[in-house]
């Protein structure tokens, strides 16, 4: 399924899948490099990697990202705690194809724009994280910012590579996607990706039909609830 992008979230050297981002919940999947190799050998050509420790300011897992980049994936996108030009350049130098930004876009736009200028628009994806209030979540999903539509408009102005819509309410729960996302998909310029709550093949079919290019999968994927997946 070429539209599926498996996610590997890394915390303290382990691949994990949290429930709504809460530390200590969900699954511990083991060595992230070994997991990435399994995914590659299963035929997945794209991968979504998040450094949870860097995002939370309690460390970084770049050494694992560096090794994952050597495996041979066609596409690697990385997010989590990228808050300065130097780190952005360092990750790109590892052959990461695109970097993912979220909070900084809405809290420090000048810094974000400087990073974009340094690494190029075509290497930047913005994750618009949101919940049932339909407002953008920032600062570790603890605060709410502007409405989703306004967030999309703000990002569209920069003509970046694309946008991920991340439905935090059901993230890691396998409880299903946000079906109202169809109203936002048509507004996005560039590559359209979705994450959060994907629980079945029918969810994936719906997202494809409303215009998403790629679907990022996590908990349901590793619980083998999606057709054709049997990785762990």
UniProtKB/Swiss-Prot annotation:
GO terms for biological process: L-histidine biosynthetic process. It catalyses: 1-(5-phospho-beta-D-ribosyl)-5-[(5-phospho-beta-D-ribosylamino)methylideneamino]imidazole-4-carboxamide = 5-[(5-phospho-1-deoxy-D-ribulos-1-ylimino)methylamino]-1-(5-phospho-beta-D-ribosyl)imidazole-4-carboxamide. GO terms for cellular component: cytoplasm. GO terms for molecular function: 1-(5-phosphoribosyl)-5-[(5-phosphoribosylamino)methylideneamino]imidazole-4-carboxamide isomerase activity. It is found in: Cytoplasm. Its main location: cytoplasm. HAMAP family: HisA. This is 1-(5-phosphoribosyl)-5-[(5-phosphoribosylamino)methylideneamino] imidazole-4-carboxamide isomerase.
């Amino acid at each position: 399924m070429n539209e599926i992008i498996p996610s590997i979230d890394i915390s303290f050297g382990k691949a994990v899948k949290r429930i709504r981002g809460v530390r200590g919940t969900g699954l511990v999947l083991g060595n992230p490099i070994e997991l990435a190799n399994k995914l590659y050998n299963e035929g997945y050509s794209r991968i979504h990697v998040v450094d949870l420790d860097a995002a939370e300011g309690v460390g970084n897992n770049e050494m694992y990202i560096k090794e994952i980049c050597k495996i041979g994936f066609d596409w690697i996108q990385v997010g989590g705690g990228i808050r300065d030009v130097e780190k952005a350049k360092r990750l790109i130098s590892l052959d990461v194809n695109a970097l993912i930004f979220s909070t900084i876009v809405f809290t420090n736009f000048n810094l974000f724009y400087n990073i974009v200028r340094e690494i190029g628009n075509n290497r930047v994806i913005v994750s618009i994280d949101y919940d049932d209030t339909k407002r953008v979540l920032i600062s570790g999903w603890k605060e709410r910012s502007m409405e989703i539509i306004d967030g999309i408009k703000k990002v569209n102005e920069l003509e970046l590579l694309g946008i991920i819509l991340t439905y935090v309410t059901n993230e890691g729960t396998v409880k299903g996607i946000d079906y109202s996302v169809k109203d936002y998909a048509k507004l996005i310029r560039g590559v359209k990706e979705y994450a959060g709550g994907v629980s079945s093949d029918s969810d994936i079919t719906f997202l494809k039909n409303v215009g998403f290019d790629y679907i990022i999968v996590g908990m349901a994927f590793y619980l083998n609830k999606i057709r054709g997946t049997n990785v762990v």
